[in-house]
C-alpha cells in the first residue's frame, strides 16, 4: 500500500507543481558550466525543441571543443499553462498525414510523418508505463498527471486512415489529376506511409453514412443525395493516416523529456518546466540563458513581446506577412459511434475526415469538429508594430459559447462534413433528422494560430534566426571598494542565439519533430557560445567571419522553405 502522506518523496511528474526539474544527483561544481537554453512555449514545437536539444546533448554534440570542463545542457521550458493545456496545439485536430488537399505529397511530408510517428510511439510507451493497472477501478485509471482518466479512451493515437472527400467541383478535378491519373505504385516502391488511393462516392458513403444509417430508422433522402453529387463524387484515402489525441500526446511528451534528462544526468543534463507567462523577449534575455527559442504561437505578436525592430525582422524573415487566426472547434462525445464492434460484423473505426471542415475521432467515444475561424488582417513588415493580436480569450469573445453558436456549429457539422440528413417517415409527414445533436457536444474548444505566406507548394512553418546579440553591463571587479560606484563598469556582450519557430499554422503535428531537430542542430552550428565565455565588444566584429568559415550554418541546416 502506498503512503500518500510521505512528503519527502516528491513526484516529479506531478503537473500541479509550478516547476518540475530533473538533474544530476551530485552537486555541480563551479568548473562545470552547462549550456543554458530557454524555450518559450509548450506546444508541439516547444516540446519537440526541448526533447531534441536534450537528445543531442546526450550524444555529446554540445560539448565545447575549446574547454573540456564546459559541457552539459540545461533546458528550461516556460509556459503559461501546463503541457497539454492552452495554446493551439492542445486543441489541434490531431490528423497526421502528408498530403495536400488535392492529394499531392507535401515537401518533407514523408520524413515529417516518420519522425512524428517515432515520437508518438515513444510517448505511447511512456503513457503505458505511467498507468498502474492495480489502480484501475470501475473503468478509470490513475495516470501520471494525478488525474482520473477514462480507460475507454483507448490508445493515444490510432492508424485508421484519413479520408478527403471532394467538396467542390474544383476539388474533384484536382484529386482526379493528382491521385486517379497518377500511378502511385508504378514501380512497386511506394512506402507504406505514402500509400494513397482514389475513392469513388460509394466508398465515401460507407465511411460517412455507415453509422448514421444503422439503427436510425429511416431511408436516405434521395433529393439530398442528388444535391451532393458533386461534393461526394470522389475523394482520396490516405492509408496510414493517423488520428492523435493531441492533449494526451503533449502531456506524455513532457514526461518523455523528463525521462530523457534523468537518463542522461551523467552527461550533466537537466530539464525544468516553469509555469510562467513570459511577458517579453527582453525579460528572458536578461536572465542567464545562452540561447533562447521562441515557440509561443500568437503570443510572439502580442504588443510589447518583441521590440519594433525585432518584430520587423521577424516579419521580413518569415516571408513578408503573418496572419493570426482565431477559431473554435466542437468536441463531440458519443458512445458506440466512432468505433463499433458488432457481434455480426468486424470492428469498424471511422477514419479522420479531412477538409476545410474536418472531423477527427481522436478517442473511441470522442471526436473534434472544426474549425470555424476568423482570419485577422495580414500584417506586413512595415506595419509590424501595429500587428493585431488574438489571444484565446479574444477568440472566446469573438465566438461566445452561446446557444446560437452551438446551433451554428451543429449545422456546419451536419451539412458540411456529413451528407444531408436522413429522412424519417412519420405518420403525418417526413421529418428531417440530423445525425449529431446538442446532446453530443462535450465542450467548445478555442485556439489561435499563426499562418505564414502561402506559396505554390502550400504554407510552411518558419524558423527565424535573429541577428542582434544581447548586450549586458557587468559589475566592476572592484565593487567591494567603498567608491565602487565611481569606478568604470566593464561593458561586455554575451552573444546569444535567439531563434523563433513561427507560422506553424495547420502543419504543427506533421512538421514539429523535424522543426525540433533543425532547431537543435542550429544551436550546435556556429557555436558562438560554445565556451560560455564573455565576449569582448570588439570581438563581436569577428562574428561574421567566424560564421562564414563554419562548415555548417543555419542556412545549410534549415531548408529554404522553412526559413
Regions inferred by a protein language model and the residue ranges of each:
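Beta1/beta-strand and adjacent pyrophosphate-binding region of the FAD-binding site
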Residues: 29-45
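Conserved Rossmann-like nucleotide-cofactor binding loop
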Residues: 45, 83, 299
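Flavin-dependent oxidoreductases
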Residues: 48, 286-411, 415-442, 454
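C-terminal catalytic lobe of FAD-dependent flavoproteins
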Residues: 436-470, 474-563
Amino acid at each position: 500500500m502506498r503512503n500518500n502522506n510521505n512528503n519527502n518523496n516528491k513526484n516529479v511528474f506531478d503537473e500541479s507543481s509550478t516547476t518540475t526539474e530533473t538533474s544530476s544527483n551530485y552537486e555541480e561544481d563551479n568548473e562545470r558550466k552547462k549550456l543554458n537554453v530557454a524555450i518559450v512555449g509548450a506546444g508541439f514545437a516547444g516540446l519537440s525543441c526541448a526533447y531534441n536539444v536534450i537528445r543531442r546533448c546526450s550524444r555529446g554534440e554540445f560539448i565545447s571543443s575549446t574547454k573540456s570542463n564546459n559541457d552539459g545542457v540545461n533546458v528550461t521550458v516556460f509556459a503559461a499553462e501546463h503541457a497539454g493545456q492552452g495554446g493551439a496545439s492542445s486543441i489541434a485536430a490531431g490528423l497526421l498525414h502528408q498530403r495536400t488537399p488535392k492529394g499531392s505529397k507535401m515537401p518533407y511530408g514523408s520524413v515529417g510523418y516518420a519522425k512524428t510517428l517515432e515520437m508518438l510511439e515513444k510517448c505511447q510507451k511512456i503513457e503505458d508505463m505511467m498507468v498502474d493497472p492495480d489502480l484501475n477501478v470501475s473503468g478509470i485509471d490513475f495516470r501520471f498527471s494525478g488525474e482520473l482518466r477514462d480507460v475507454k479512451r483507448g490508445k493515444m493515437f490510432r492508424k485508421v486512415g484519413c479520408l478527403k472527400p471532394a467538396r467542390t467541383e474544383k476539388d474533384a478535378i484536382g484529386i482526379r489529376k493528382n491521385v486517379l491519373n497518377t500511378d502511385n505504385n508504378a514501380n512497386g516502391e511506394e512506402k507504406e506511409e505514402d500509400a494513397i488511393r482514389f475513392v469513388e462516392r460509394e466508398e465515401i458513403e460507407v465511411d460517412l453514412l455507415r453509422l448514421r444509417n444503422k439503427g436510425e430508422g429511416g431511408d436516405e433522402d434521395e433529393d439530398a443525395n442528388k444535391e451532393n453529387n458533386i461534393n461526394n463524387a470522389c475523394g482520396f484515402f490516405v492509408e496510414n493516416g493517423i488520428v492523435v489525441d493531441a492533449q494526451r500526446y503533449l502531456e506524455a511528451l513532457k514526461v518523455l523529456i523528463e525521462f530523457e534528462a534523468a537518463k542522461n544526468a551523467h552527461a550533466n543534463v537537466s530539464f525544468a518546466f516553469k509555469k510562467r507567462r513570459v511577458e517579453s523577449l527582453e525579460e528572458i534575455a536578461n536572465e542567464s540563458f545562452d540561447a533562447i527559442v521562441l515557440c509561443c504561437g500568437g503570443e510572439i505578436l502580442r504588443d510589447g513581446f518583441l521590440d519594433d525592430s525585432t518584430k520587423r525582422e521577424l516579419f521580413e524573415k518569415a516571408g513578408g506577412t503573418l496572419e493570426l487566426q482565431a477559431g473554435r472547434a466542437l468536441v463531440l462525445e458519443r458512445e458506440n459511434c466512432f468505433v463499433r464492434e458488432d457481434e455480426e460484423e468486424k470492428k469498424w473505426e471511422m477514419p479522420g475526415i479531412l477538409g476545410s471542415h474536418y472531423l477527427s475521432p481522436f478517442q473511441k467515444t470522442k471526436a473534434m469538429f472544426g474549425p470555424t475561424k476568423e482570419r485577422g488582417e495580414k500584417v506586413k513588415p512595415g506595419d509590424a508594430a501595429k500587428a493585431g493580436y488574438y489571444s484565446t480569450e479574444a477568440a472566446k469573445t469573438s465566438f461566445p459559447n452561446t446557444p446560437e453558436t452551438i446551433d451554428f456549429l451543429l449545422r456546419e457539422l451536419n451539412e458540411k462534413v456529413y451528407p444531408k440528413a436522413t429522412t424519417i417517415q412519420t405518420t403525418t409527414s417526413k421529418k428531417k433528422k440530423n445525425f449529431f445533436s446538442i446532446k453530443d457536444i462535450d465542450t467548445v474548444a478555442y485556439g489561435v494560430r499563426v499562418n505564414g505566406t502561402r506559396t505554390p507548394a502550400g504554407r510552411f512553418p518558419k524558423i527565424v534566426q535573429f541577428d542582434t546579440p544581447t548586450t549586458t553591463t557587468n559589475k566592476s571587479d572592484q565593487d567591494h571598494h567603498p567608491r565602487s560606484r565611481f569606478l568604470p563598469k566593464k561593458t561586455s556582450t554575451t552573444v546569444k542565439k535567439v531563434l523563433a519557430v513561427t507560422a506553424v499554422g495547420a502543419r504543427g503535428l506533421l512538421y514539429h519533430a523535424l522543426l525540433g531537430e533543425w532547431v537543435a542542430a542550429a544551436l550546435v552550428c556556429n557555436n558562438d557560445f560554445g565556451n560560455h565565455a564573455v565576449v569582448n565588444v570588439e570581438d563581436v566584429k569577428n562574428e561574421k567571419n567566424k560564421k562564414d568559415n563554419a562548415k555548417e550554418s543555419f542556412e545549410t541546416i534549415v531548408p529554404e522553405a522553412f526559413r
